[in-house]
UniProtKB/Swiss-Prot annotation:
Keyword Disulfide bond: yes
Signal peptide: 1-22
Assembly and oligomerization: Monomer.
Disulphide-bridged cysteine pairs: 52-66, 56-77, 71-82
UniProt cross-references to Pfam families, sorted A to Z: Toxin_20
PROSITE patterns recorded: HWTX_2
Role description: Neurotoxin active on both insects and mammals.
Protein name: U4-theraphotoxin-Hhn1a
Keywords of this entry: Disulfide bond, Neurotoxin, Postsynaptic neurotoxin, Secreted, Signal, Toxin
Cell compartment(s), UniProt: Secreted
Tissue spec. comment: Expressed by the venom gland.
Length: 85
């Protein structure tokens, strides 16, 4: 009886450890796959910088105080540029 119980508990422990390790590997592989290539990220950064600076320049030409456009997705407008928060 003791041997059976020890065997069952050992198998359960091995199964839990194996499952945890498999989940970690899967999460790591998804992190590596998900996301944009560096060239696409650079294009997004350039677009945000352009949108933010153009918005501010338009407001300056209209003789209004420069109220900086709110950048989205973890970015904010600072010194006429979008910067990552």
């Amino acid at each position: 009886m003791k041997v059976t119980l020890i065997s069952i508990l050992t198998c359960a422990a091995v199964l839990v450890l194996h499952t945890t390790a498999a989940e970690e590997l899967e999460a790591e592989s998804q992190l590596m796959e998900v996301g944009m290539p560096d060239t696409e990220l650079a294009a997004v950064d350039e677009e945000r910088l352009f949108e933010c600076s153009v918005s501010c320049e338009i407001e300056k030409e209209g003789n209004k105080d420069c109220k900086k456009k709110k950048c989205k997705g973890g970015w904010k407008c600072k010194f006429n540029m979008c910067v990552k928060v």
